[in-house]
Amino acid sequence: MRFLLLLAMATATCNALATPYPDSGRIYRDFKDDSFFKPAPRRDEPKAEIEGATPLAAEGEAIFVQGFEVHGNTLLPEERIHAILSAHQGRELSGLELHQVAEELAAAYLDAGYFAARVYLPPQAVTNGVLQLHVYEGFLEEDGIAFTNPGARLQDEQVHSFLSSNLSEGEVLTVEAVERTILLINDLPGVNSRSTLYPGEEVGSARFLLQIEEEPSISGNIDADNFGSYYTGEERLGATIYINSPSRRGDQVVVRAVTSGSDSNYGYVEYNTPLSGNGLRAGVSVDYLDYELGKQYRSLDATGNAGELRGFLAYPFLRGRHFNVFGQVDVSRLELEDSNNSGLEADRTIDKVEFSLHGDHDDDHWADGVTYYRLAVALGDVGINGNDAFKAFDDQNSETEGGFGRFNYEFARLQHIQGNLSTFLSLSGQFASQNLDSSQKFFIGGPFSVAGYPTGEISGDEGTLLHADLRYDFYNLPWRGNLQASVFYAAGWAKLFKDTWSGWNDPNPELDNHIMLQSAGFGFTQTWDETFVLRGLLGYQVGSNETEDPDSGEATDGSSKNYRAWVQGIYYF
């Protein structure tokens, strides 16, 4: 059958080059990458301001302090308090030093997360050489939560839900509870907030005031890049619109469109909304891609489409200024169709559930830095709905139909070194239970991978990607804005098929199932406020190119050059 012959030839060519056949699964992944349409970074996360701090007393007559008595403590271990105070007993202390002792004890409460706690010296604080210290641990008084809200972006009921879900009246205020409250509200689209803690009516109590500030109801970005597929158009134009809190509940509508012209078009629509004040969100999205292959496949009239319907739940297990852990569950159905004028009908349906955990943590190790991570487990089923010839081809070769599982991981570290110098290291990868459909594979090549190679130069059922760069930031430039220059090295390893079959690498028996690509180069990122970002990257191939055509020496983009240049511009509004 002519169809089988052409399909076998195409697959053999694909295997000989160790590159993925340009089908809907591969092209869909090029557009699906959410790094293309993240919103502009928001300003620094605020923290609660504290009013009512007591100034130090003036220097007074020194008093001999034999010991200490602490009243009102229920939170700190006695051993911790003794360790702090024992260094000051058995000697004379001035009035200023007495207050410094109280401040040192208050700092211990702050370190433990009780940042509304206060330590006071009562009148006649020293009796028979024993200094009395009164601790007020800073509980939130009854009816101690208040807020101001313009109301155009967020209903008062919604603000109250977040406050009451995370702050408890009558209980001691902690850094974790206050930060979580503020940040969960700031995570809501269309609003920001400022907060203040001030003394309550009772001694040792506190009140919490939140001020809601409104942001634009519509925001978004327009972007242009050359990140697209060689076969469907490398130059692309995209736009993303965020409709923030249209129902005044903290919900959001996201609309994105990307086109490379007549050869590929992609659209994405998402709606997400909070389900409760504890940060739980739910959402649904739908997207659609259509394409037509160009270059050497133009004569085949090779076309296809892909569309996914997805629902998800997301929850912040930990939300703070320095430590975050988020969990998410996605349930989706992806439908893929590929056809040409030679009888190819490669229709597939992929049902999948994915469980993911991601987060970040900043610290002051070796100066300061941020660690990022993401772990994901996906379980799914591939149904082949194409014609009998395509089903037979899959059954006799890669056998992707049926259940599958994959595990993805990513770890990254942004580390400040000194002054304007920093470094970024990342390691990501994938493991699979069996041979995967092209839409589920691990891709290597392109601006966010091994940049010396075309987008998606190779794909594997399993793979690993290592990236390291050194960055230097320039500020107050003559043309305004800030510039970050970097040099990088990246290496990717791919196992093309989890399980090979007889003749899988025909007509190139020298082809190995394990491929490694390396690249080094330099790049820049120029930003002007939070309005415009311009990125450029030049990657050179390091070592041999195991993916090149053995006859022409060309990669999948039809070029034999050993470097690739990438450019992206994003305008935020």
Stretch-by-stretch model annotation:
Residues G204-A206, G233-L237, D263-G267, N305-L309, ...:
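Residues that define the transmembrane beta-barrel architecture of outer-membrane proteins
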Residues S247-Q252, S276-A282, L318-V325, D362-T371, ...:
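Short loop/turn motifs that connect adjacent beta-strands in outer-membrane beta-barrel proteins
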Residues T19-G228, A257-N265, F407, L427-S428:
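Periplasmic polypeptide-binding modules associated with outer-membrane biogenesis and secretion
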Residues I241, G311, T531, S559-F573:
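Outer-membrane beta-barrel "beta-signal"
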Residues S219-G228, A239, G250-G261, G267-V269, ...:
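Transmembrane beta-strand segments that form the barrel wall of outer-membrane beta-barrel proteins
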Residues I212, I243-S245, T273-L275, Y315-F317, ...:
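Residue-level signature of outer-membrane beta-barrel architecture
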Residues G220-I222, D251-V255, L280-V284, V325-V329, ...:
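Transmembrane beta-strands of outer-membrane beta-barrel proteins
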